[in-house]
Each structure stands twice: as structure tokens, then as C-alpha cells.
Amino acid sequence: NPTLYGELAKGQSPKFLVFACSDSRVCPSHILDFQPGEAFVVRNIANMVPPYDTIKHSGAGAAIEYAVLHLKVENIVVIGHSCCGGIKGLMSIPDDGTPASDFIEQWVKLGLPAKSKVKANCNNLEFADLCTKCEKEAVNVSLGNLLTYPFVRDALVNKKLSLKGAHYDFVNGAFDLWNLDFGISPSLLQ
């Protein structure tokens, strides 16, 4: 479409920042039916959003900052998915702390609060079901981590931004979308 790409050559103004997994089976533009220019997309193992830190994980922080402050996206969506290898890896990390990899394990440990919550509340489930619960809970952890970014909190308080969690079950063809009520108020910005 020459007209579309002619417009895109002039710049971008996406309404969405999407965090999605690097998994080749789950393309966020396909899942959400986005056309070029409609979403600023960050993909990584297990669709993790790290907490605010100007040194560690600065690539993710730079993408969030650019999307919120410069592109002025109106929505941030974190999408988890079924059969996520990153979450399976997180759930498989030995409790004794024995490292199994150099990079992957350190990255997925961002989701340890999700693993802890799932194991505490659902430990009677089979491993695959625990992983499914953790896929969704890790999205919630990432949504919480987004609140550690001052410019995200500011945009939320000023009603210029919304946060949504999602889970795509590609095996059963289901897509769940949710909001979390964080109780953000102007007093939290001080």
C-alpha cells in the first residue's frame, strides 16, 4: 500500500506500546490485527517488563520512555501466551538457586513474584497448569513493574495512558484482556 507507507515515511504515531514474547508462534501484530504504524512493539523472552532502573535492562526502559514521552502512546498492553518456554523455564528454576543458564534464567527471574504467588496459591496443580497460571500472573507483575517508571505513573494519573494485561491461548484460540486497579492517585507521585 504505497499511500500507507508514504504516510509512515513521515513519522509514526502509534496508540499502543505492546510487550510480547519473542516466541515465533505469537506475533502481536497478527494477534491484535495491527497494521504498520499502529503499535510500538517490544518483544523479549516471556514478555517481561523489568522495573525502572537506569542501568539494568535499559533497553526496555528506553522503549517505554520513548513510547510514553515521545510517541505519546495511549495504551500499554502486556501480552502473555500459552505454552511459553520462558515461563516454563521460570517455573523450573530450582529452589536451591542452582543456575542453569547465563542470560535466560537471569531475565526470567523478573517473574519470580509471579512464580511465588502461583506456587503459594495453586501448588496442588499439575506443572502445565501451574505454568498457565504463571503466564497470566507474570503479566500482572509486568504491569506492576510499569508503575515503577515515573513517566508511566504520571501519564496514568493524568488519564493520558491505560495499562492492560492480556493472555493469548493459541492452542484453544482464546484471548483474554484485563485491567488491574492499582489505586493510582496524585499523592503517589510525590
Curated annotation (Swiss-Prot):
Lineage: Eukaryota, Viridiplantae, Streptophyta, Embryophyta, Tracheophyta
Enzyme category, top tier: lyase
GO cellular component, one term: cytoplasm
GO molecular function: carbonate dehydratase activity; zinc ion binding
Name of the protein this chain belongs to: Carbonic anhydrase 2
SMART domains in alphabetical order: Pro_CA
InterPro entries: Beta_CA_cladeB (IPR045066), Carbonic_anhydrase (IPR001765), Carbonic_anhydrase_CS (IPR015892), Carbonic_anhydrase_sf (IPR036874)
General function of this protein: Reversible hydration of carbon dioxide.
Quaternary structure annotation from Swiss-Prot or TrEMBL: Homohexamer.
Subcellular location: Cytoplasm
Pfam families assigned: Pro_CA
Domain of life, source organism: Eukaryota
UniProt record similarity statement: Belongs to the beta-class carbonic anhydrase family.
GO BP: carbon utilization
Catalytic activity, reaction form: hydrogencarbonate + H(+) = CO2 + H2O
EC number: 4.2.1.1
Keyword Zinc-finger: no
Keywords, comma-separated and alphabetical: Cytoplasm, Lyase, Zinc
